[in-house]
Swiss-Prot record:
Disruption phenotype: Mislocalizes ATG8 in the cytosol, when ATG11 is also deleted. Forms a stable complex with ATG17 and ATG29. Interacts directly with ATG29. The ATG17-ATG29-ATG31 complex interacts with the ATG1-ATG13 complex. Note=The interaction with the ATG1-ATG13 complex is induced by starvation. Pfam families: ATG31. It comes from the Eukaryota. Keywords: Autophagy, Protein transport, Transport. Its main location: other. Kluyveromyces marxianus proteins are shorter in length and have a more ordered secondary structure than their S.cerevisiae counterparts, which might contribute to the superior thermotolerance and solubility. K.marxianus could be therefore useful as a new model organism for further elucidation of the molecular details of autophagy. This is Autophagy-related protein 31. GO terms for biological process: autophagy; protein transport. The keyword Glycosyltransferase does not apply. Plays a role in starvation-induced autophagy. Involved in mitophagy. Functions with ATG17 and ATG29 at the preautophagosomal structure (PAS) in order to form normal autophagosomes under starvation conditions. The gene is ATG31.
Length: 139
């Protein structure tokens, strides 16, 4: 199996730009992961390198033909919402969320009027809906 390309979309950025498309490699809210180390569960010798500075760990379960059976993200900051495999491009698209950004607390200085507060509530609702949708898909 060739090493797949990982394409990540941060749902929070997509929400702010009203663009939640996951079907395009040209999505402006997507980025390609770099500085990737691959760890395989087989008899190949493991590269000697320092693994202590890794921030995120993706566990990708696949068969010998490259069909993905599951993806898991171990991270203190990010939550994996969903993934999709694009076989022709040998690409795995990941949909992640880093945090609920829409802070609705009254001490937040940039809520100046009712429209900006309504926009924050809307953003928070979209984020929560995405989280719930990802939980429903897992069942």
């Amino acid at each position: 199996m060739d090493t797949p390309m990982l394409l990540v979309t941060n749902v929070n950025d997509a929400i702010q730009n009203d663009d939640l498309r996951m079907d395009s490699l040209t999505n402006e809210n997507a980025w390609f992961l770099n500085n990737i180390s691959y760890i395989f569960e087989d008899d190949e010798p493991i590269q000697q390198e320092d693994h202590s500075n890794y921030e995120n760990l993706f566990i990708i379960d696949s068969d010998l033909n490259g069909k993905i059976s599951g993806v898991e993200l171990l991270s203190e900051k990010w939550q994996l919402l969903s993934y999709d495999q694009n076989k022709p491009y040998n690409c795995i698209s990941l949909r992640v969320m880093d945090e609920l950004r829409a802070d609705l607390s009254p001490q937040d200085g940039d809520v100046k009027d009712l429209d900006s507060l309504a926009r924050r509530y809307h953003d928070r609702n979209v984020q929560i809906r995405n989280l719930l949708d990802s939980l429903i898909q897992e069942d």
